[in-house]
Curated annotation (Swiss-Prot):
This is ATP synthase gamma chain. The gene is atpG. The keyword Transmembrane helix does not apply. The keyword Transport applies. GO terms for cellular component: plasma membrane; proton-transporting ATP synthase complex. Gene3D superfamilies: 3.40.1380.10, ATP synthase, gamma subunit, helix hairpin domain. It comes from Methylorubrum extorquens (strain CM4 / NCIMB 13688).
Amino acid sequence: MPSLKDLRNRITSVKATQKITKAMQMVAAAKLRRAQNAAENGRPYAERMAQVLGNLAGNLIGGVGAPRLLSGTGQDRVHLLVVCTGDRGLAGAFNSSIARLARDHANRLMADGKTVKIITIGKKGLDVLRRQFRDQIIASRDIRGNKPVDYPFAAEIADDILARFEAGEFDVATLFYSEFRSVISQIPTAQKLIPAELPTAEGASATGAGSDAAMEFEPNEETILETLLPKNLTVQIFRALLENAASEQGARMSAMDSATRNAGEMIKKQTLIYNRTRQAMITKELIEIISGAEAL
């Protein structure tokens, strides 16, 4: 049985931990509101841009003149996996779920005889994936600590991917991130970046992006797509980073709330044990005093 001193130290330690988890929960809640607003504001722009590009590309996919970012290389041998996680832990299954989705995808590709290359965004994804894919990881970036992600950072990533594609380093690129649904729901997601997956003209019309009217473009569709597809690559990566930021804060807030409640339960349990132990010691001492008095 632990001594009273051990129990007091244990209770003090758990209370200190509870203060830390409570503070982290409050910080995550404050950051979540800003990150959630940014993610929700970025979605319509990214979706609308994809719809516009889908309208433009409706008659070009697979045809002559289609940009390579849209039609691809015509091969399926080398796959680039861009895995976006966070730099910090204590966020529940946020980082591990994204890394697991990417790992399973990589294993399937390698089982089919494909070559896999990986770029990690965030320290935690790098830590997990390099255990199995050290030779496949060709680049890694941090999320710049606690600073919120910005568009130039997404543009740097997109430019690197685009340069590697133009150099013929890969055929297909897939982005892995966590889509934010709510504080308790973040969905690990895989999105194909190259060749770009765009809504069809029919799908864009159904969502209001299209029209039955005949449209002419100046310059032509090919030229517009050549200009907008690289920008769309940046936009989709930026959206993924915003979704990730909101998902990370939501997961951390939920995890720290659970840790705070668990610490409270542990404090109650340890306090009860402490009181019972103290009561037993007092009772034992009283019995010894009474027995000694009777012996006299």
